[in-house]
């Protein structure tokens, strides 16, 4: 399974075990406490799927306070050298063949039509080879909220989905 995966940064044992458990799953939740390396595990998971030729695009939806931190984290932890990283409101997404393409977006943007439109275009074109990562998934705990509905609808056709949180959800969005 992941035993031949070459990490760029050495994982702690709990991170290695988390990757082993979730690596091949279509849908998986990384429920790990704050500061235990959920982001690194998710990046390794995306890179492993890319190396298996299962994905070429990753959408990261994260709170405004952290979504741009993903740029530094991807560069720090990704063993894939051919990266194309785009952040919503900074870069427009331009797919690069032969690269692992990352698109980072603030979760708040998905409460608005403009943010939804950007992700619709990406998901329509790359859904069969795409992974969606929802960082701090508790931001969609209310299934009747517009943002939650938009994220669930956009994620439906995507092949691989991951949610990350250090806090359990009080209301299930499903």
Regions found by a protein language model. Give the residues of each.
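Short aromatic/hydrophobic "clamp" motif used to bind/position activated sugar donors
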Residues: 161
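SF2 helicase/translocase NTPase motor core
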Residues: 1-30, 35-148, 153-157
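Active-site segment of extracytoplasmic enzymes that catalyze sulfate/phosphate-ester chemistry
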Residues: 168
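Conserved phosphate-coupling serine/threonine residues in phosphotransfer and NTP-handling enzymes
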Residues: 165
């Amino acid at each position: 399974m992941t035993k031949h995966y070459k990490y760029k940064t050495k994982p702690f044992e709990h991170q290695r075990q988390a990757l082993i458990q979730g690596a091949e799953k279509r849908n998986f939740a990384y429920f790990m406490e704050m500061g235990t390396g959920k982001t690194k595990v998710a990046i390794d998971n995306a890179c492993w799927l890319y190396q298996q030729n299962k994905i070429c695009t990753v959408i990261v939806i994260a709170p405004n306070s952290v979504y741009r931190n993903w740029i530094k984290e991807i560069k720090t932890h990704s063993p894939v050298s051919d990266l194309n990283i785009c952040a919503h409101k900074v870069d427009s997404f331009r797919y690069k063949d032969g690269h692992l393409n990352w698109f980072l977006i603030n979760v708040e943007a998905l409460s608005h039509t403009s943010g939804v439109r950007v992700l619709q275009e990406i998901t329509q074109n790359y859904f069969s080879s795409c992974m969606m990562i929802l960082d701090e998934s508790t931001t969609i705990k209310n299934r009747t909220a517009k943002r939650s509905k938009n994220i669930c609808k956009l994620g439906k056709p995507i092949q691989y989905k991951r949610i990350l949180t250090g806090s359990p959800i009080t209301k299930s969005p499903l």
